[in-house]
Amino acid sequence: MRLDAWDSVKQAWRLDFMDDLRVLLREKFGHQSLRSGQAEVIRPLMAGRPVLAVFPTGGGKSLCYQLPALALEGLTLVISPLIALMKDQVESLTRRGIAAARLDSTMDAEGLRALYEDLDAGRLRMLYIAPERLANERFRERV
């Protein structure tokens, strides 16, 4: 197999970001290595390509989007139909010092105000929302 100069640059970039991801994996999530299949999901995400990943319950799906969310710039929207799962994920991330929040129907006015303040200030890395939230035009314009 022949690599031209551009392929070498791309390969070096891939290795660099995988090294950075390993550091984040250890420091933020306390894992020494990725599980089987996770790197194959994360690589295209880091390159801006869409991915469909199907893993069993407990197979490490969340880490496949959480790790790139920390490595890449901006806000990552996580669409989840289950409020209980959103709460668990956000609590776990905030315990790790990761700026995450959820936006769901159980929130009171004060919680919504604080969330939108954080969102507008760019303080959030991950925002968990229900699928129907995407139907709200004001929300889509805001994010």
For every predicted segment, state its role.
Residues R102-D104:
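Residue-level recognition of beta-strand->loop/alpha-helix junctions
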Residues G48-L67, V78-I79:
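Walker A/P-loop
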Residues G59, M107-V143:
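Conserved helix/coil segment N-terminal to the catalytic DExD/H
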Residues R14-P56:
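Conserved pre-motif I regulatory segment
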Residues A69-A71, L93-R95, E117-G122:
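Conserved catalytic network of the ASCE P-loop NTPase/AAA+ motor domain
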